[in-house]
Amino acid sequence: MNTRLLLRNLLEPVYRNHTGFKQQLKSVQGGLDRLRTGASERFPTLIRPNPRNIYLTLTSACNLRCKGCRYGRDFMPNEQLSLQMVREVLEDAKEANFEIVRLYGGEPLVHRNIVEIVEECSRLGLRSYITTNGIVLKKKIDDLYAAGLRRLSVGVYGIGEEYNTYVQRKDRFSQLEDNLTYVRDRYGDKISMVLNWLLMKPTCSLDVVRDTWKFAERYGMPIFINLVHYSLPYFTMGYDDDLQFKPEDRPAIEAVVNEFLRLQAQQPQLLPMSPTVLRSIPDWLVKGANMRVPCDRHKLIWVGADGTVQMCYVTFKLGNLHEKRLRDMLFTDTHVNAARSAFALNCPNCHCGYDSRTSGHAPTRQQYMGS
């Protein structure tokens, strides 16, 4: 076990219920990240693969049909990872000291072995969470909780009919409410739920922000702001690019960010994102690939439903699980070169990890610190 993982395991029981202490630890970690990033800009050979998180796309299948998503349609249709393949990946991740396993899709809860996969994470002592649309949580959560699941992140793409319009299915928002109510009523705060809110053109309004805040209050779900993508291979621009922002949308984006900052000042526990990161959002959305901030995806491994293994969502392919084990793809020359190319932005330069990239790069952080 590496030093970082050992310290986290020792300190977690202390900071779990002490938000202030947790924020202090995050501040220290941010300072260390900035030192490493600064040194690596001067000496690129310092960049090495350091995978901490692994994202497993368990299946391309989904029970919704979101406007911006291509999963299961023309992106990896009819693909899913087998239980045996997932077990081997998790064993290799444990051996390589990965810290967090994200289970997602598609919709991971429609994978027939989702409970066994969570059980395997628990058996190996890997911290796992599921990213879900929440539509079938009520049917699955009891077995998942028994298997050891304690963390969920739930995608929210609007409130009420705005949500139904985006997912292109009737009455799904009311189903989402019913499922979240069941989880909260049955398990209270024994299960952590994060609200993954997507900031795109249809949700970029003060009314939507305020409605989303009330929704987060209702279910005790801290908000993380995801930004609409322009370079992910499984994400579309919508119909006539109706999801994407243009330069003339900057005032509306800034108004939304300012409203989040106002609400955060009143209830910081509902938006545990740095104000510095929030202030950077308009530039991330408007500048797109011209937002030149070193990438930290050398800390990630992404696995597609067809077995593809990459260092990030978009590019830097390392191999395929149908051909070799994960352990044989890690820390190779290909992996090292990918880490250095990503850091140097020799890639499509998406905004994945915009929060850690902003806070982990001293000049960028300084730019958005505010007065």
Language-model features: locations:
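Radical SAM enzyme [4Fe-4S]-AdoMet core and its adjacent flexible, acidic
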Residues: M1, L5-E12, D143-Q310, V314-N320
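Conserved alpha-helical substructure of the radical SAM core
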Residues: T3-R151, L232, F245, I253, ...
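Flexible mid-to-C-terminal extensions adjoining Fe-S/redox cofactors in radical SAM and related proteins
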Residues: L5-V14, L35-A39, P44-L46, A289-C295, ...
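Short helix-terminating capping/connector loops at secondary-structure junctions
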Residues: P49, G188-S192, S341
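Short, intrinsically disordered, charge-biased short linear motifs at domain edges
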Residues: R52-L56, L278-D283, L330-S341
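Generic structural signal for small/hydrophobic residues in well-ordered secondary structure
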Residues: L58, C62-N63, S82, L176, ...
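Residue-level marker for beta-strand->alpha-helix junctions and adjacent short loops that shape enzyme
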Residues: A61, P108, I135, I159, ...
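Secreted/processed peptides and extracellular or luminal domains of membrane proteins
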Residues: G68, G72-F75, I301, L318, ...
